[in-house]
Amino acid sequence: MLARSIQKYYIFVLLFLLAILQSSCQQSGNKYRILVVHSYESDYVAYKDCDRLIRESLEKKGINPSIQTFYLNCEQYAAPAEEKRMYLYLDSISTWKPDLILVYEDQATYTLMQCHHPLISTVPIVFGGVNFPNKALLAQYSNVSGFWDEPDYVTNIRLIEHLLGKSTIYMLHDSTYIDRHIKATLHEQCAQADIRVDNNRIMYIPVEIATLDRVNQSLKRPDSTTVNVVPVQGDKLSAVSWYMSKHVPYIYYLQAKRDYRVLNTSRFSSKPSFTAINEDLGYTNKLVGGYITSLETQIEESTDRAAEILKGSPSESFPQITKSKKNYVFDFNEVKYWNIDKRLLPKDAILLNFPFKAQYPRLFW
């Protein structure tokens, strides 16, 4: 009787091991080659999490990925050099034959299509985190589809007003393709919401015309919330420094893009800063939060689409542009640092860097 029980036990163990071996063989046999293309530099702080989330999300969807990653480093190169780098890189991996390309953010998505490498027309491509998709360029590639992270400036403006009261919100712009679209979209959205937008308005008072009345007026809370779009060029930079200082109340920064000209604005500001995009939120740039497509949502959406394509759905069967889901997302550390009343946060808000002890206080009484 004992011998028979032992025999059954060994048979069960053997069958279990065979099942694991078979599953392992199937997974290794179905390995998919996926190229991931990022816009920014390789040491951008969020990419470590981003790349981990991509792999984990694909594996949860039954995809066993073999991943290669290319970092465009868009801040270091002008457009022609970016396109050449992209073309040469695609040449170098052509023999690897990727099954699918995942590309993130505006610069990499545009450059990938604009370089016109033959590979781009034959491999399914899924983009994510794109604020301003180039529809004319997309129309040339039926195999490209993805997710439009359309910035919602008005909701973010109203969020700042809700948390901090009537304010002047300043945004920084340059003359790039993305900057032109930011400015046009901002004006369009604010016009519909009856929010005044000023361009290049200097809000500090030069010493030669300063009077006590003018200075006192500049320190008062405004009667309504407005937006001031400030160029990051020439003499306007002194205004930016003034806005960042603690000497002028009721003026707050709203991040609309990530590039070298504006990268450290929130970090060095003496007042709370907010964001309409997910870049840098929850990391080192002292951003309180905003109404955005979170990094997690960005990865989930794009890898969902990628998995469907790899499992047999034609890439042409999806709409080329799908709007991304948005949430209120805040960095708990910055909310606490700036002493923002947590009761004012939207009830469905996502809190990054929320400590376990704060989440379950009764465990630490």
Region annotations inferred by a language model:
Residues F12-Q22:
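Bacterial N-terminal signal peptides
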Residues L2-I6, C25-W365:
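Short hydrophobic alpha-helices and adjacent helix-cap/hinge residues
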